[in-house]
A protein has these predicted regions:
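Catalytic-domain carbohydrate-binding cleft regions of carbohydrate-active enzymes
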Residues: 1-220
Length: 220
C-alpha cells in the first residue's frame, strides 16, 4: 500500500461542505493520523471541492468579495439522506477559480488546515464544476475573465493551476500531486492526473478504462 484517499465528510455536515478543515468529531487528532500513516511509509491525499457550504470560513470570505457563483451545485440538500430533500437546500456555491484573489483564498485554507498537518496530495473533485439543473441565465454568470459561457471549459485548468502554483511557491521539498475529475488542454504541467469520473465497480467498466485512458492521453 502506497497511498490512501481520505474522501469527503471529514468536515462534518453539508452546511460545512468543503470547509477544508477536520470538523467531523470522528477526526479528533488529524495530525497524529498523518504521522501514523507516514510512519507506515504510506501517503494520503484528501478530497477537496470547488463549492463551499454557507457555514464555512472560505464561503464567508469569498462571498464578501463577490467571488461565488449562484447556480446550483453539489450538494443540493443540507440533509444527508438520499434522494436530496430540497426543502432544505444546502446553499453550497462554487468559487470563481478564474479570480486570482479567489485562488489565493482557496489555497490559504488548504495550506493552514490541511497541508500543515501533513497531507501529501489533493484529490480535486467537481472540477468541472458540478452544475445542476442549468438554465440559460446560468451561463451569463460573470467571472473574473468574462461570462461563464465563454470560459467554462477552462475551469479545471484554473482551479488545479491555482493549487499547484501556490504549493510550489510555498515549498519545493515535496512534489505537487493532484488527482482531478476534469481537465483542460495543458493541464499536465500542473502535476495533475485525471480519472474518468464516477464509475461503478465491475470488470466491464474496468475494461473500458484502458481505451479511455489511452485516448485521453493521446488527446493531450
Amino acid at each position: 500500500l502506497d497511498g490512501i484517499i481520505q474522501d469527503w465528510r471529514y468536515w462534518g455536515s453539508n452546511y460545512l461542505w468543503n470547509a477544508m478543515d477536520f470538523l467531523n468529531e470522528e477526526f479528533s487528532d488529524p495530525k497524529k493520523m498523518m504521522e501514523d500513516i507516514h510512519g507506515m511509509n504510506a501517503h494520503i491525499i484528501i478530497s477537496i471541492w470547488s463549492a463551499f457550504g454557507p457555514h464555512t470560513k472560505p464561503y464567508r470570505e469569498l462571498d464578501k468579495g463577490n467571488m461565488l457563483f449562484n447556480f446550483r451545485t453539489w450538494p443540493e440538500s443540507g440533509s444527508e439522506k438520499w434522494p436530496p430533500n430540497m426543502d432544505y437546500p444546502s446553499g453550497a456555491r462554487v468559487y470563481d477559480a478564474y479570480h486570482p484573489q479567489a485562488r489565493d483564498i482557496y489555497w490559504k485554507y488548504l495550506n493552514e488546515n490541511l497541508r500543515s498537518v501533513g497531507i501529501d496530495g489533493w484529490w480535486m473533485d467537481s472540477t468541472e464544476p458540478d452544475h445542476f439543473h442549468p438554465i440559460p441565465e446560468d451561463f451569463d454568470t460573470p467571472t473574473y475573465l468574462g461570462s461563464f459561457r465563454k470560459v467554462r471549459n477552462a475551469y479545471p485548468l484554473m482551479s488545479v493551476g491555482g493549487v499547484y502554483d501556490h504549493q510550489r511557491a510555498v515549498t519545493s521539498d515535496k512534489r505537487v500531486f493532484i488527482l482531478t475529475r476534469s481537465a483542460f488542454a495543458g493541464q499536465q504541467r500542473y502535476g495533475a492526473n485525471t480519472w474518468t469520473g464516477d464509475i461503478t465497480a465491475s470488470w466491464e467498466v474496468l475494461e473500458k478504462q484502458i481505451p479511455a485512458g489511452l485516448n485521453f492521453s493521446l488527446c493531450g
